[in-house]
Amino acid sequence: MIEIEALTKRYGSITVVDRVSISIATGSITVIVGTSGSGKSTLLRMINRLVEPTSGRVVIDGSDTTSEPAHLLRRRIGYAIQGHGLFPHRSVAENIATVPRLLGWDAARIRARIDDLLKIFQLDPGEFSAKFPHQLSGGQQQRVGVARALAAEPTVLLMDEPFGALDPIIRAKAQDDLRDIQRRFGTTIVLVTHDIDEAFRLGDRVAVMSNGQVLQYDRPAELLTHPADPFISRLTGTGDRAMKLLSLTTAGDAAEQGPAAGPAVAASATLREVLSDLVWSGAPEATVLNADGTERGRLTLDRVLARGRPD
């Protein structure tokens, strides 16, 4: 659990973050979203004390972050930034090994961790360990950057616009990979972005910031259906609210029991994708299949459309 309590940062007479208080559940992904200058990156950096707060405090698992030296705190909190931030003169393996070496891990443990992480990120250790950052694609660089942030097995991972420099296809894959890895390790992730679609795609909860304040901290569906401020309505958009809402639910979660004669859709597909399939095929319902090919249930067009409306 991360408790952010009345956290404030001022530079002279300018207040960048203004008495922010939020609680972040262990093992969840929280996304902080806002426009440029809203204070979101400053808030993130106060969690690991890259920026020292003017007032307020951060408590991680019951311990105030000021109770230990800042450099020791940062060694147990993963940190990934836009553009990967890899050391250009170090190999992939050396980059990933950075924090474990600072923590005094033995060579065998470090080597095993490097190999495990590269395999998890679908990078062959034999092929990629000795490569340097300039020899990697943008997507590969970003994966190595996240692998480095996870190398010392942190319970908390901070990410500042980690996918902002990637093209849309690679970015979507990187987002899916992050979700899969978070489920695997149970890491508590706090991620900053200016992209509301990315926030909804990744976040269990989303904090919307403007002028240094958190206007609303809630589940994505609540931000769409019950925005607490006109700024949130503008940020989330009104023209495609139904599509965004459908993107938040999977076919497996919405399926009902009963046979269906329509096109097959994966249980992991979003209702937005199911709607597209039904409109394209002209079918009134779809058959929902589990990953192993067994039938999960069915989804009618009416049931899908109902999920695109507020309660």
Regions found by a protein language model. Name each.
Residues D64-G78, L102, A108, H226-P227:
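ABC ATPase NBD coupling module
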Residues A108-E127, D180:
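Conserved ABC ATPase "signature" region
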Residues E153:
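Conserved catalytic motifs of ABC-family nucleotide-binding domains
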Residues Y217-D218, H226, R298:
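ABC ATPase "signature
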Residues N48:
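Helix-to-loop junction immediately C-terminal to a conserved catalytic motif
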